[in-house]
Amino acid sequence: DIGGGDQFKADFLRISPNNRMPAIVDHDPIGGGSALPIFESGAILEYLAEKTGQFLPVDPAGKYKVLQWVHWQMANLGPMMGNANHFKNYGKNIAKDPSQLEYGTKRFVGEVDRLSGVMDAQLSANQFLAGNEYTIADIVTWPWAFLIGRLIDESMWTSFPNLKRWVDEIHGRPAVLKGRKVGEELGKRELTEEEEKARRELLFNQTNEKVRGAREEAAKSA
């Protein structure tokens, strides 16, 4: 429960020292041995792809073509969209002076626009991000790209037709529809005003001091 702060508990910090979701524990890891915890979505997807033999080419050229787009998303689209959403949507609930948000909003929304162009250009010559096969590059990027119109403006899709085609195509995949249904079920309960205020305080005002105790407890039993 992200809104409830489960990611700051010592048990979770033992798995994910950066107190962020997602994280997994494989009790039957590649190569055997004890249970293997993995955090960061890109690392998780790469591991699962290797374990299952799916969504990641085995030849070096194909593999690294995919991985470069996985890392591109992790370093660019995800962080920039997170920051853009913070300044454009959540910041207004925190900042006393709206003018404090103007630079951050312009900076990060502009960067999301630029990154949309990067994807659109790549998808003009490829069915998927790393070529003509659906891979973990698409899996890790789509959840962010799907929300670009909502973040900026739905009319922006006219500027990125190849990106829109890709977003819609992946949205229709059975596994994606199934996953989205799970997410919708989890998010059905509406928070009270006090719960929403506490959630914002928890998620958007993080410091080392807030998680120091849990981190020290996790380190003792590591």
Predicted segments, located by residue:
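GST-like domain detector, emphasizing the conserved glutathione-binding G-site
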Residues: D1-K106, S116, K210-A222
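Short, solvent-exposed turn/loop segments enriched in Gly/Ser/Thr/Pro and often Arg
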Residues: G3, I136, G183-L186
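Alpha-helix/helix-capping structural signal
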Residues: A43, P174-A175
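GST-like fold's C-terminal all-alpha helical module
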Residues: W69-P174, K220-A222
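Segments of small-molecule ligand-sensing domains
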Residues: R180
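Acidic/histidine-enriched, glycine/proline-rich intrinsically disordered or flexible terminal extensions
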Residues: G183-A222
